[in-house]
Amino acid sequence: MRLLLVSIALFIGSTSAINLIGRTQWAAAKGKLMCEGRPASGVKVKLMESDNSFLPGFLDRDDKMASGKADSNGEFNLSGSTKEITGIEPYLAVFHDCKDGITPCQRVLRINIPKSYANWGSSAEKTFNAGNLELAGKFPGETRSCFN
């Protein structure tokens, strides 16, 4: 039991240390969201960074770099940063109810952003273009979320 507590304390301390010794890294993404051929305005989009810990989602949750909503044309443009020791693994999380009927919670589409679109520095150097995304279809790996 003592070893477990010491291990947890060391892990928490090391994740806090990332903010002290990690370097600021940036990513940016844009795109257009559609639902059955119409702009999907108001859809929440988050620019996230994947933290691959030994206990995913427990002690080291994914970092939110930026968030926003699609405009009246269904377009979004996000740019954000986070501190990490190693290179970041950015992705987009799109939370929507397109063709969802009365099913509770929202559908979540995850779009991985190539690491080549991430950089160290004071702002994003390149913007990943997710293109036009039709949300009416079903996507492999799609999940649901009631808390976003």
From Swiss-Prot:
Query: From what superkingdom does this record's organism come?
Result: Eukaryota
- This one is known as Transthyretin-like protein 3
Tell whether Signal is among the UniProt keywords.
yes
Keywords, A to Z? Glycoprotein, Secreted, Signal
The organism that produces this protein has a lineage beginning with:
Eukaryota, Metazoa, Ecdysozoa, Nematoda, Chromadorea
Q: Where in the cell is it found?
A: Secreted
Q: What residue stretch is flagged as signal peptide?
A: 1-17
Q: Give me the Gene Ontology terms describing cellular component.
A: cell surface; extracellular region
Q: Which residues are glycosylated?
A: N77
Known Gene3D superfamilies for this protein?
2.60.40.3330
Q: What is its main location?
A: secreted
Species of provenance: Caenorhabditis elegans
As for family, the record states: Belongs to the nematode transthyretin-like family.
